[in-house]
Amino acid sequence: MEELDCEPAVTWIPGVNSKKKQMCFDWGPGEMLLCETSFNKTDKSEKVPSCPFIYIIRKDVDVYSQILRKLFNESHGIFVGLQRLEEELSGKSRKAQLVRVSKNYRSVIRACMEEMHQVAIAAKDPASGRQFSSQVSILSAMELIWNLCEILFIEVAPAGPLLLHLLDWVRLHVCEVDSLSADVLGSDHPSKHESFWNLVTVLVLQGRLDEARQMLSKEADASPSSAGMCRVLGDLMRTMPILSPGNTQTLTELELKWQHWREECERHLQDNTFAANPHLESLCKIMLGDEATLLEQKELMSNWYHFLVTRLLYSNPTVKPTDLHLYAQSSLDMFLGGESSPEPLDNILMAAFEFDIHQVIKECSIALSNWWFVAHLTDLLDHCRLLQSHNLYFGSNMREFLLLEYASGLFAHHSLWQLGVDYFDYCPELGRVSLELHIERIPLNTEQKALKVLRICEQRQMTEQVGSICKILAMKAVRNNRLGSALSWSIRAKDAAFATLVSDRFLRDYCERGCFSDLDLIDNLGPAMMLSDRLTFLGKYREFHRLYGEKRFGDAASLLLSLMTSQIAPRSFWMTLLTDALPLLEQKQVIFSAEQTYELMRCLEDLASRRPECGEPDAQRLQDDDIETTKVEMLRLALARNLARAIIREGSLEGS
Amino acid sequence: MLRREWHRKGLLQQTPFFHRPLKERHTLKTCESQTACEDSNTGGWKCSQENCVSLWSIGEFGNLDSDGGFEGDHQLLCDIRHHGDVMDLQFFDQERIVAASSTGCVTVFLHHPNNQTLSVSQQWPTAHYHTGPGSPSYSSAPCTGIVCDNPEIVTVGEDGRINLFRVDHKEAVRTIDNADSSTLHAVTFLRTPEIVTVNSIGQLKIWDFRQQGSEPCQILSLTGDRVPLHCVDRHPDQQHVVATGGQDGMLSIWDVRQGTMPVSLLKAHEAEMWEVHFHPSNPDHLFTCSEDGSLWHWDASTNAPEKSSLFHQGGRSTFLSHSSNQASVHLSLVSSWLSTDPAKDRIEITSLLPSRTLSVNSLDVLGPCLVCGTDAESIYVTRQLFS
């Protein structure tokens, strides 16, 4: 057992009196039921009225957020696409595809973030506004981390392009500059705007030198005295060698050019070219990567990773991935300057710069309130073949563990559970078992939902679950007096025992009411009739009635007899069958042959002789017995008369 | 071509088109003004607390940009809470919407265009219910299907009951208890006052409200294995032609005037077919959607081959021939759906959704517009069906 990385968080449930210590709880899929018990251990005589509430504690509250639901739904599509991609991917296109997938994930996070932002602005009460805003910042942090992981682990950018990616990363996430820029440019005299120099500095800090140059030219136009200096600095900005994607120059060439450029910058600084204008001098120092000057602009950079990237841009543009963590650590230390301690986000980013994937995932799992992020990121990194060697001391590997956790959370939701199915499908080791356990616990409030669940089970050959779901539905239908439905469900489940039970109900109803219900089903059973003997009997018995109704007495009679002789009819039903034979026996023409009549007589005697000896006779019992005896007598009489007629008829037919 | 119009997620900068309530079902309607602006109406599918019926506007025709794409002109007009899952949803008239609930309740919502709100204008709380030994008085049964024909509303449910309501009457005009021993899945008008219902044991029943009693006037059924039927639609011009979709994804075309078996059985989807619709003004075209996540366009108008070539750009394009089990000869006005000459008649099928993952639960079509809702909680809209 590993040690705990942090103390588990305590959740306070309002309304529960924890001092009384009478809690009981039960785990459900993804949630916990908690209630106060009515047991009072001190004295039983005085019943303190206990709290009448049951509390439901949900682990993944984020699943219930309306906006985040879109995140779950959209990312599900991307996830499934990625798993399918796996089969056809190889070699070079593989990386490009994985990067594309990663970008898709990020675009979904971004879209959710934007929508959440809109909602937060529109929120009427400040409390919910704050709540949405905090969600926005969480989503933004997720995207920040994901983007960095994409650059470092998926893109695996080499020295050179690495810095370009990091610059894009910072530009994307520190985006206040755009509104500032619009603000300044929108004013009448941009260069007189109070934030003008801030803007220019931020542009230089982010390496957006073209824009910075345009700004400087505005300053040059406005104040002719500094025009010369602005031109010199603008030229420096223009000539700064950068790696452009289409360029074929080697890193060494670039480094050489860069050194020359840097020396030129230094020369201007030593010559005090910009001494007259402290703003321009500071800009030049920034372009030389002067750490002290950079740290003066802390406010404008707002965070240490911006500082890191700016520092690298102007001091080591061809930084190797392996050296990154050294710069990162020192940048963090310098930026915080011992004044504050790093926050969870800082630790996560630092772990990423150290290329410690497991640490990134671990820290994210602790810091974030849901499993969405770690599950999807881990899965993607696993597809990059970065996690193969890591096995947990429980369950299977980390990817699967996280996916299972995430999918279980989804399954607790009344609507998102369908997404969970696909996640379970792509967990080779424990996914199937988990799915089996979860799918049986989905509340089936409509048949449509039940059909969806059944389809999922049938596609995966989960026969046991199919059976149990059909049984639940059949049971429900019986309880609602919907025998036809119940029978359909038990036929679908091929559940012979239940079909027998339902058939018995049908027969009992028939005995009570004297007519069949649900003829549309019973008349159309077809081969399904063979599912259980009782069902066969039900179908055949109904057929007998139909034949009788159509006045096909001969067929009806032989069917009736065969039902008894072949032992399909339950013995308890024989008396009814024999009573049904009465009108046939009393018909004008002879229907039962002598042989058939003998058979009927045998059945009747068989039944009469096996009548159970009753214990205490009561009035009701006696009356019943009386009716029964009369019936038997009538039958005997009818049989005897029919036998006589049959013998005469058969004899005369043969004789003639 | 077709695919591009699907309104959906893009890369980084594009905001995906998402939809709030779950598992939409919807219908389309034309607005009062003749500018042919459309509203699509959508509703939630799932559990109690969060479902709502929402009214969306998907913008006007004809203002597409050069790319054929649309951005941002679909808009949520209003929504209202709905108790229980929305099992079916239909426009009653220009401003009224009828919703079927899994609680057995049938509600008529009224849309107020002035202040863009929805309100309940009529409600039958216990339209569908079970009576059983387990329940003291009654327990609710989901209402599975509705069909409207002003001023009448017919509803069917899992309790096998058929209700005929009039929108201004508090009580049901006519109720047929135990109309079916199994679950009734869908209903449609054949010709007033006759309706067709389909049930979970593969039967198609025709009912005439002029007749008393609880017996259908005709039962048609699939052969043998009682595959449940989930949806039904009637040909808009030829009232004897009916299409149904079943649990096995088969599309059946029936001629209710003759025979008790379908005229043709067409192998279609791989799982439950949830909805089938003839195009209201162009009935040679048929649309089906399924649990397997596909949405298909069936085109039986291929007698003019040069016209059909327009549809070739779509993804899947297959030719199927009718498997006919009945030799019927109609010399005059033969519907393209009933003709049985396998050599001559072909149906061209185009798949309208690019990737198949989760179930497409519902669809509706009007003019060049088609709307469908999926289990991935999104709505797809295309406005160029025939281009």
From Swiss-Prot, chain A:
Residues carrying Phosphoserine: S223
The organism's place on the tree of life at top rank: Eukaryota
Entry's Gene Ontology BP terms: chemotaxis; lamellipodium assembly; macrophage chemotaxis; mRNA export from nucleus; nephron development; positive regulation of DNA-templated transcription; protein import into nucleus
Residues with N-acetylmethionine modification: M1
Coiled-coil segments: none
Location within or outside the cell: Nucleus, Nuclear pore complex; Chromosome, Centromere, Kinetochore; Cytoplasm, Cytoskeleton, Spindle; Cytoplasm
UniProt-listed Pfam families: Nucleopor_Nup85
Gene Ontology molecular functions: structural constituent of nuclear pore
UniProt modified residues of type N6-acetyllysine: K92
Role summary: Essential component of the nuclear pore complex (NPC) that seems to be required for NPC assembly and maintenance. As part of the NPC Nup107-160 subcomplex plays a role in RNA export and in tethering NUP96/Nup98 and NUP153 to the nucleus. The Nup107-160 complex seems to be required for spindle assembly during mitosis. NUP85 is required for membrane clustering of CCL2-activated CCR2. Seems to be involved in CCR2-mediated chemotaxis of monocytes and may link activated CCR2 to the phosphatidyl-inositol 3-kinase-Rac-lammellipodium protrusion cascade. Involved in nephrogenesis.
Annotated family: Belongs to the nucleoporin Nup85 family.
Subunit relationships: Component of the nuclear pore complex (NPC). Component of the NPC Nup107-160 subcomplex, consisting of at least NUP107, NUP98/Nup96, NUP160, NUP133, NUP85, NUP37, NUP43 and SEC13. Interacts with NUP160, NUP133 and SEC13. Interacts with NUP37, NUP107 and NUP43. Interacts with CCR2.
Protein name per UniProt: Nuclear pore complex protein Nup85
Lineage, broadest ranks: Eukaryota, Metazoa, Chordata, Craniata, Vertebrata
